[in-house]
Regions:
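A surface/secretory-pathway sequence property marking extracellular, secreted
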Residues: 62-98, 165-173
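Short, solvent-exposed loop/turn segments enriched in Ser/Thr/Gly
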Residues: 33-38, 129-133
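Sec/Tat signal peptide C-region and signal peptidase I cleavage site
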Residues: 16-21
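Low-complexity, intrinsically disordered segments enriched in Ser/Thr together with acidic residues
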Residues: 99-127
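Extracytoplasmic/periplasmic copper-protein system
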Residues: 32, 138-175
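Low-complexity, serine/threonine/proline/glycine-rich extracellular segments that form mucin-like
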Residues: 35-73
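Bacterial N-terminal signal peptides that target proteins for export
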Residues: 1-9
Length: 175
């Protein structure tokens, strides 16, 4: 009985450590037509190497993006046209931020940090769906591509060498 408890506990802990090893959003759900502060949590580097760059692709319908600068990191903002117009405070938006990156810093593998931006979840987004923020994490040695997006009906995605899911945000009904 005790051995089964230990084996079961070890399995749960192993699953938890794998799940917490991914880059994730602090708040993983928010209502459409609302402001959203995205806090991207980076819990580790690449196989022991320090993180030197984080690049985030902004999904369609996440508009009005404003990144938070980080001391010691260079911030780069890429803007472009949206696939369709979105409404922001009564005005139609046809272009905006499509990618953010922080580079030139050094986050040792033994430490944790967060990369933050504010945004608006457009009223045109559909409640009940999930939007994904693909992230590329570059390190002194190596790279992680947290870009896997599950197909409809799947619970996760599998990349080379194991799961590398993109952080997801579940859209709740408008308040």
């Amino acid at each position: 009985m005790f051995r089964r408890f230990i084996a079961g506990s070890a399995s749960v802990l192993a699953a938890m450590s794998c799940a917490s090893a991914h880059i994730t959003l602090e708040q993983q759900q928010a209502p459409v037509a609302s402001s959203y502060k995205a806090v991207m949590r980076v819990p580790h580097g690449c196989d022991g190497a320090a993180t030197t760059s984080i690049r985030i692709r902004i999904p369609e319908g996440v508009i009005g993006v404003k990144p938070m600068p980080k001391p010691g990191w260079q911030l780069n903002v890429v803007s472009g046209k949206y696939a369709k117009p979105y409404t922001l405070r009564g005005a139609k938006m046809t272009e905006g931020v499509t990618e953010l990156s922080w580079s030139g810093g050094k986050l040792p593998d033994a430490y944790y940090d967060e990369f933050v931006f504010t945004s608006v979840l457009a009223e045109e987004l559909e409640a009940g769906k999930t939007v994904y923020f693909p992230v590329v994490q570059e390190c002194e040695k190596g790279i992680h591509r947290w870009i896997e997006i599950p197909k409809d009906g799947e619970h996760g995605a599998q990349g080379e060498g194991g799961p590398q899911p993109a952080p997801g945000l579940r859209l709740l009904p408008k308040r």
